[in-house]
């Protein structure tokens, strides 16, 4: 009788092992529970296992900073640090928009790029030629800003033969253009210009915009020195 019981127990164990193998092949989640149970450990329930797997780290999605509102008449110019060379062999210098405009009447105009045709042939030469007339109307300084590095701006100044009439400033990282909301994305153009600044000319008194001639894109219709003189 004892031998029969032993044989029956052996057959049951063999059947259980075979069933375990079938479970292992057909259901990985069940095999995990069976394996833990066979070792005397607590089985991981299916719903708990699903929760553990779903708790894998997820990549955080950061929202991009909202674009700045486009500058308008009556606005205070945002502060930014611009760089320049005051002479061919001089040291690199920086000036903030705040320091440039504090307590002064300043004409600031922007171009999409140094050495580009319209900027080189019309926009900058026009302000160089009219700088004296602008000063006669109370303007303390005339400055051109572009999203180019300071070395390019120095080379451009030398090629144009610009003296003290107009200060050529580098907004190399586009800090001022972004803060003013006047970015101009030219990434789709074959010249490789990337993101630049829209063309504009403005008059600021103690940092507050009094006159603003902002072009659509890189057009050149209202931002000339002549148009600024008419507005003064």
UniProtKB/Swiss-Prot annotation:
Keyword Transcription: no
Disulfide bridges in this chain: none
Transit peptide: 1-62
Predominant place of localization: plastid
BP-aspect Gene Ontology terms: cell redox homeostasis; cellular response to oxidative stress; hydrogen peroxide catabolic process
One GO cellular component term: chloroplast stroma
Places the protein is found: Plastid, Chloroplast stroma
Superkingdom of origin: Eukaryota
Domain Thioredoxin, first and last residues per copy: 71-232
Reaction equation(s) it catalyzes: [glutaredoxin]-dithiol + a hydroperoxide = [glutaredoxin]-disulfide + an alcohol + H2O
A GO MF term: thioredoxin peroxidase activity
Keywords: Antioxidant, Chloroplast, Oxidoreductase, Peroxidase, Plastid, Redox-active center, Transit peptide
InterPro entries per record: PRX5-like, Redoxin, Thioredoxin-like_sf, Thioredoxin_domain
Further facts: The active site is a conserved redox-active cysteine residue, the peroxidatic cysteine (C(P)), which makes the nucleophilic attack on the peroxide substrate. The peroxide oxidizes the C(P)-SH to cysteine sulfenic acid (C(P)-SOH), which then reacts with another cysteine residue, the resolving cysteine (C(R)), to form a disulfide bridge. The disulfide is subsequently reduced by an appropriate electron donor to complete the catalytic cycle. In this 1-Cys peroxiredoxin, no C(R) is present and C(P) instead forms a disulfide with a cysteine from another protein or with a small thiol molecule.
Assembly and interaction partners: Monomer.
Role of this protein: Thiol-specific peroxidase that catalyzes the reduction of hydrogen peroxide and organic hydroperoxides to water and alcohols, respectively. Plays a role in cell protection against oxidative stress by detoxifying peroxides. May be involved in chloroplast redox homeostasis.
UniProt similarity note: Belongs to the peroxiredoxin family. Prx5 subfamily.
Designated name of the protein: Peroxiredoxin-2E-1, chloroplastic
Native source organism of the sequence: Oryza sativa subsp. japonica (Rice)
């Amino acid at each position: 009788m004892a031998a029969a019981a032993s044989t029956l127990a052996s057959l049951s164990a063999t059947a259980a092992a075979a069933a375990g193998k079938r479970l292992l092949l057909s259901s990985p989640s069940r095999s995990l529970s069976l394996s833990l149970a066979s070792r005397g450990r607590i089985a991981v329930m299916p719903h708990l296992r699903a929760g553990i797997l779903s708790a894998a780290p997820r990549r955080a999605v950061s929202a991009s900073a909202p674009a700045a509102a486009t500058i308008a008449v009556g606005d205070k110019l945002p502060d930014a640090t611009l760089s320049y060379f005051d002479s061919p062999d001089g040291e690199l210098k920086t000036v903030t928009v705040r320091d440039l405009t504090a307590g002064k009447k300043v004409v600031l105009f922007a171009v999409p790029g140094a050495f580009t045709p319209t900027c080189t042939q019309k926009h900058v030469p026009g302000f160089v030629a009219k700088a004296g007339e602008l000063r006669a109307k109370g303007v303390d300084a005339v400055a051109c800003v572009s999203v180019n590095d300071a070395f390019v701006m120095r080379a451009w100044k030398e090629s144009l033969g610009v003296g003290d009439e107009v200060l050529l400033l580098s907004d190399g990282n586009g800090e001022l253009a972004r803060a003013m909301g006047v970015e101009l994305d030219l990434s789709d153009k074959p010249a490789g210009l990337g993101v630049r600044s829209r063309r504009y000319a403005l008059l600021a008194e103690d940092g507050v915009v009094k006159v603003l001639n902002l072009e659509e894109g890189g057009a050149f219709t209202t931002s000339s020195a002549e148009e600024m003189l008419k507005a003064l």
